[in-house]
Amino acid sequence: MDVVARFMVSYSGTACAISLFIFGITLLFPFHKSQSFVCMNSHSWDIFRNKAKREFESNAEKLIKDALRKGLTAFQLVTNMGTYLILADQYAEELRNDKRLSAYDALNDVILLELPGLETMFQGSLHNHVSPTAIHAMNRELVHLTRALSDEANHRLQTQWTDSSEWHTVSIHDTVLALVAQMTTRAFVGAELCRNAEWLDIAINFTINRAIAVQAVQAWPWILQPVVHWFLPTCKAVRRQIQRARTILMPVLERERQTMHRKDSSSDRIFSTLTFIDQYAQGSRYDATMAQLRLTAVSVLTTSDMVEKVLARICEHPELIQPLREEVVSVFESSGLHHKSLLKLTLMESVMKESQRLEPATLISMFRAAKKTVTLQDGTTIPKGTRLAFANDLRLDPELYPDPETFDGYRFERMRKDPEQAKLAPFTKTRTSHLAFGHGKHACPGRFLSCDEAKLILCHILLKYDFKALDGRVPDLHVRSMFIQRDTGGMLSVRRRQEEVTL
C-alpha cells in the first residue's frame, strides 16, 4: 500500500482505526463532473445517497468487478464518505509519477488534521516531509538494524508463546500485533522504549483511538466540527493519550540529545528515527511526539495485517512449513544473521507476496487527488479536484497470473527463474500488476522495514515452534467496504521445538 494508504481496516478490535483513516484520506471530497463517468451504485431518488453507501459497504468488491466486466476503465463509486473515481490498473504506469496528482492532498483537510489531537500530519514545510525523509534514512540503515530487530522478535515471541513443549493456544492477532509494535518501536525510538508496556500500548492503540475520534467529529456538520471536538469524549481521550506519550518520549529524547553531544559518543550507535528527525530539524520547532505517533500510525497496524494474513495462508497450506523451515536453516547456517541473509529467503518472499496479491489491505490502491485537470493518453479526462484510486485489477489477471484465484506459494519463486520477470519477483518491488504498496514516487517507503520485520517474525516462528490452526480453523477472510481482512479472533496451537540454528 502506498504512502497515502498505509492504513487498512479492522472492524473488530484494531480496526475501526485504519478503515476510517483510509476513508478519510480518499473519499470525503465531492467529485467534479467535467466528464461523464458511469456510477456503479447510483440510484434514482437516492437524494442523500444512503442506498448507494449501503451498497458500497456490503458489495464494493462486486461493484468493482461488475464495472471491469463491462469493460469500464474509469468509473465512479459512491461511498459513505463521498464519490470518487476508480481507474483500471492499465493507467497506473502512465500516472505513477504525475506531479498533477498529489498523495499529500488526498490527506489534507480530510481527516481533520488541524484539530488539536488529530494533527498527525502537522503544518509547515518541515512537518510535511520529515516523516517520509526519516523512513528513507531508516531504509539505508536497515543493514545495521537486523540484529536488534531479531532480538526484539525473540524476546516478544518467548514472552507471548513461552518455551512450553506442550501444545497450547495463542492468538494470531495479539501475537503479531505485539511483535510488530515492539520491533517497530525499536527502529523508531530505540532500545529504551521498545519494551516499555505503556509506550507499546500507545503505539498499538493511538491509531485506533484517533480514528474513532475522527468518526465522532465527522458525524457533526462541518461548520460545528472546530468547536464540538473540544467536548467529545473520544477526542478528549486522544488528547490525553498524546499527552501521556509526550511524558514518556521527551525525557528519552533529551537523554539522546545529551549523548549525541558528548565527545565520547559512539559513532556506531544504532539508528533511530527519533534522533534522526531531531538532527534533521536542525533546531527548527517541531513536535517530536507527534512525529513518532505519525510514523507508528502508518507502520504497526499495516505490517501486522500483512503478517497475520501470511500466517493464515501458511496454516491453510501446512505443506509449506517444512520447505520454508529448510530454507531458513540453510540460509542462516551458511550466512549467519545479516541483512543480506534475509534477501536470500526467496521462497518466504514468494509466500508473502502471493498472500499479499490475493489479500491486499484494500480492494483499491494508489489514492490520489488531482491538483489540475489531467487528460490521459486515450483521451480520458480526470477533472481538477477529483479524488481517485486504482482498481487493483491486474493482480487477478489470468494472462499475468495463471489460475489467479488460487494461492500458489511458489508462484513468485518460479518467476525469479524467468529472466524477463525475475526483477519483478521481490516482495518490495512494485508493478502495475501488484499495487499493494502503490507504485511510483509515492510507493510506500516503509515497505522495506515491513518486509524485514515479517521475515524475522516468520524465521523465529518456523525455527522455534510447531504451529497449526486451532482445530484446523483458519481465520476467516472478510471483505467489507473496500477493506480485506482476516478475522482477528483466529487462534493457533503452538509448542516449542528445538531449532536447528540459533538466530
From Swiss-Prot:
Subcellular location as annotated: Membrane
Record keyword Heme present: yes
Knocked-out gene: effects: Impairs the production of glandicoline B and meleagrin.
Catalytic EC class: oxidoreductase
One function term, GO molecular function aspect: oxidoreductase activity, acting on paired donors, with incorporation or reduction of molecular oxygen
Principal place of residence: membrane
Entry keywords, A to Z: Glycoprotein, Heme, Iron, Membrane, Metal-binding, Monooxygenase, Oxidoreductase, Transmembrane, Transmembrane helix
This protein's pathway: Alkaloid biosynthesis
Transmembrane domains' residue ranges: 11-31
InterPro entries according to UniProt: Cyt_P450, Cyt_P450_CS, Cyt_P450_E_grp-IV, Cyt_P450_sf
Gene Ontology, cellular component aspect: membrane
SUPFAM superfamilies: Cytochrome P450 (SSF48264)
Binding residues for heme: 444
Recorded topology in the membrane: Single-pass membrane protein
Glycosylation sites: 205
Stated induction or repression of this protein's expression: Expression is decreased in presence of phenylacetic acid (PAA).
GO biological process, alphabetically ordered: mycotoxin biosynthetic process
Entry EC number(s): 1.-.-.-
Cofactor: heme
Applications (biotechnology): The indole alkaloid meleagrin was shown to be a good candidate to control c-Met-dependent breast cancer proliferation, migration and invasion.
Main function: Cytochrome P450 monooxygenase; part of the gene cluster that mediates the biosynthesis of the mycotoxin meleagrin. The first stage is catalyzed by the dipeptide synthase roqA which condenses histidine and tryptophan to produce histidyltryptophanyldiketopiperazine (HTD). HTD is then converted to roquefortine C through two possible pathways. In the first pathway, prenyltransferase roqD transforms HTD to the intermediate roquefortine D, which is in turn converted to roquefortine C by the cytochrome P450 monooxygenase roqR.
The family this protein is said to belong to: Belongs to the cytochrome P450 family.
Descriptive protein name: Cytochrome P450 monooxygenase roqO
Organism in which the protein naturally occurs: Penicillium rubens (strain ATCC 28089 / DSM 1075 / NRRL 1951 / Wisconsin 54-1255) (Penicillium chrysogenum)
Gene that this sequence comes from: roqO
